[in-house]
Swiss-Prot record:
InterPro entries referenced in this protein's UniProt entry, alphabetically: Rossmann-like_a/b/a_fold, TilS/TtcA_N, tRNA_Cyd_32_2_STrfase, tRNA_thiolation_TtcA_Ctu1
Extra remark: The thiolation reaction likely consists of two steps: a first activation step by ATP to form an adenylated intermediate of the target base of tRNA, and a second nucleophilic substitution step of the sulfur (S) atom supplied by the hydrosulfide attached to the Fe-S cluster.
Source organism: Roseobacter denitrificans (strain ATCC 33942 / OCh 114)
Secreted among keywords: no
GO BP, sorted A to Z: tRNA thio-modification
Subunit structure: Homodimer.
Chief place of localization: cytoplasm
Function summary: Catalyzes the ATP-dependent 2-thiolation of cytidine in position 32 of tRNA, to form 2-thiocytidine (s(2)C32). The sulfur atoms are provided by the cysteine/cysteine desulfurase (IscS) system.
Record-given protein name: tRNA-cytidine(32) 2-sulfurtransferase
Enzyme type, top EC level: transferase
């Protein structure tokens, strides 16, 4: 690991010199690299649109990708992107100033999706679905305009687990957000390189680095969201049985269609005795 500030990317200037932080940084790099390689995210001459919301997860994503690129382990071009959605009180200057200071190529765009969401969604209903759909549409458009082949998101292991249980409890299906997919139009990849990284590690890293975290008041102000309920359940399981989250995550990589009930995945009718 490089220790001198003139030998590392500006995103890591001022990094703690503690053994604990070095282990955390090494773990983040290893887990992210493993996910990138495992799910085949690297294309020749690729350009990635790295989405930056200002939350702890997206800061971690940006820093770790630049760490990999700095080491010569990520041969792609990176363009950071923040979509200012017009939320009241959003500190519009924080991210542009941060990215300029960190010498990170970026694009910041203002689109007032907040007003659309508040106008279209009945009072008391969850805002997240429409907000996410509008944001995704703009990010895809920006990626095309910038000549990017992939939109890169900061979802981590815990997001993936929570989505799995939301689909299980409320959607009646076994599914979650995949680490890699192709959009409906078929012209862009969507990557989640932090798929193997825990939320706790993202929090520890961004806090230790002192990045200017921007809270999502639009989502966080809503009580009783399904995701928050599932998060509380998972936290309870983890407290009673430490390591439970990682065991469940491993299960998502170790499915056995023959031991489930989906006839689209396994031909039960075609089973024959010898």
């Amino acid at each position: 690991m490089l220790d001198h500030s003139d030998e590392i990317h500006p995103l890591f200037h001022g990094a703690p010199k503690t053994t604990e932080f070095r282990k955390l940084r090494k773990r983040l790099v290893r887990q992210t690299r493993d996910a990138i390689e495992r799910y085949g995210m690297i294309e020749k001459d690729a350009r990635w649109l790295v989405c930056l919301s200002g939350g702890k997860d997206s800061y971690t994503l940006l820093a770790v990708l630049y760490e990999l690129k700095w080491r010569g382990l990520l041969p792609v071009e990176l363009l950071a992107c923040n979509l200012d959605q017009g939320q009241p009180g959003f500190p519009a200057t924080v991210l542009p100033e941060f990215l300029k200071k960190m010498e990170v190529p970026h694009r910041v765009e203002y689109q007032d999706t907040y007003s659309i969401v508040m106008d279209k969604v009945p009072q008391g209903r969850t805002l997240c679905a429409l907000c996410s759909r509008l944001r995704r549409g703009h990010l895809y458009r920006i990626a095309r305009e910038e000549g990017c082949s992939a939109v890169v998101l900061g979802h981590h292991r815990d997001d993936i687990l929570e989505t799995f249980f939301m689909n299980l409890f409320h959607g009646g299906r076994l599914a979650t957000m995949p680490p890699k997919l192709v959009n409906e139009e078929g012209d862009l990849f969507v990557y989640r390189p932090l798929a193997h990284v825990s939320e706790a590690d993202c929090d520890r890293f961004s806090t230790a680095m002192g990045y200017p975290i921007i809270p999502c008041d639009l989502c966080g102000s809503q009580d009783g969201l399904q995701r928050q309920q599932v998060k509380a359940i998972l936290e309870g399981w983890e407290k009673n049985s430490p390591g439970r989250r990682q065991v469940m995550f491993k299960a998502l990589m170790n499915t056995r269609p023959s031991h489930l009930l989906d006839t689209a995945l396994f031909d039960f009718a075609g089973l024959a005795r010898k």
